[in-house]
Design a protein with these regions (language model features):
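N-terminal glycine-rich beta->alpha transition that marks the start or flank
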Residues: 11-14, 19-68
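A glycine-/small-residue-rich N-terminal strand-loop-strand element
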Residues: 68-91
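Short helix-loop-beta connector
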Residues: 82, 110-113, 135-141
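Mid-domain Rossmann-like dinucleotide-binding core that forms the NAD(H)/NADP(H) cofactor-binding site
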Residues: 120, 124-191
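Short amphipathic alpha-helix with an adjacent loop that forms part of the alpha/beta core around
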Residues: 192-203
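Glycine-rich phosphate-binding loop and adjacent beta-alpha segment
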Residues: 211-273, 280, 303
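C-terminal capping/lid region of NAD(P)-dependent oxidoreductase domains
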Residues: 269-273, 287-303
Length: 303
């Protein structure tokens, strides 16, 4: 099968198209003919070797976690999907390929495009997981750092829908977009963040969800009066040195939440913004954009 492969750790230039051995569904897995693959910042961090301590990767490797496509092979013990089902989920063999295997998938609603489907699994799970860990409730104020990105934009919507007052950070060009998602106020990230947040939220914030890094954790801690128990980052590896929780994955069964989010997107009640769709052969370009950190929404690759 055709796939994108990296056989060394490095920049986007480490990615190259290659013919590799076909993958097949094992027990509890399905094989998916890939219709679209989502690109996540974590893909670039794995490719660069920065995540080797946390997610050991054996080279050569096919990148990609988000996958959407049609089931064409079902492994032993799988009872909830059949060959021909349209699904989305988390690839275990790398999704930047003709075929991928996965054990965690849900059926794709008819109203959901392939591109939207591929944009949802990682971002949706991450957004909901950290909101649950923070325990934000109606009436509280949440600061979302990186509110225009794939994870941040979903976190803003999910929190606002639950009655949480959301303050988002984004570049100036994305302020209006973040307000459309449900944020009560938006400020520009960077130096002086704490002061800008206080201007728009003089009552303070109750929790901080850092999806983007950009050195925001010291400001987040300052805004919470020096405490770190309600600050969580998914992007800043300096978290441990600051006493902040770095959330890199969950232990809760993710499929029910994904199925619900997919339904909401299909019904137009939750927005998944696809920033750009590129052919699989341009995975290197997609990683260059993703590594830059300014995509408004999700990058998606299609065969």
């Amino acid at each position: 099968m055709e796939a994108i492969v990296f056989d060394r750790f490095g920049g986007p230039e480490a990615l190259a198209p290659r013919t590799v051995a076909d993958v097949h569904a094992g027990p509890g897995q399905v094989r998916i003919k890939v219709a679209a693959a989502g690109v996540n910042p974590i893909d670039g961090k794995i490719r660069s070797g920065a995540m080797q301590q946390f997610i050991p990767t054996q080279l050569p490797a096919v990148p990609g976690i988000d996958v959407a496509g049609v089931v064409d092979e079902v492994g032993e013990g799988v009872a909830d999907v059949v060959v021909g089902d349209e699904v989305l989920g988390w690839a275990e063999s790398g999704s930047y390929a003709e075929y991928a295997v996965a054990s965690q998938v849900v059926r794709k609603p008819a109203g959901l495009s392939w591109e939207q489907a591929a944009a949802l699994p990682v971002a949706g799970e991450t957004a909901q997981r950290v909101l649950d860990l923070l325990g934000v409730t109606a009436g509280e104020t949440l600061l979302v750092n990186g509110a225009a990105g794939a994870v941040g934009s979903l976190a803003v919507q999910l929190a606002a829908a639950a009655g949480v007052t959301v303050v988002g950070t984004a570049s100036e060009a994305n302020h209006a977009y973040v307000r459309e998602l449900g944020a009560s106020a938006v400020v520009t990230y960077g130096e002086g963040l704490a002061a800008r947040v206080r201007e728009v939220a003089p009552q303070g914030v109750d929790a901080v969800y850092d999806t983007a890094g950009h050195g925001a954790l010291p400001d987040a801690i300052e805004l919470l009066g020096g405490t770190t128990d309600r600050v969580i980052t998914i992007a800043d590896q300096a978290a441990e040195s600051l006493g902040v929780v770095f959330s890199g994955g969950g232990t809760v069964e993710p499929r029910p939440a994904l199925a619900e989010q997919a339904r909401l997107v299909a019904e137009g009640r939750l927005r998944v913004r696809v920033a750009e769709v590129l052919p699989l052969g341009q995975a290197q370009k997609a990683h260059e954009i993703s590594d830059g950190g300014h995509a408004r929404g999700k990058l998606v690759l299609t065969p």
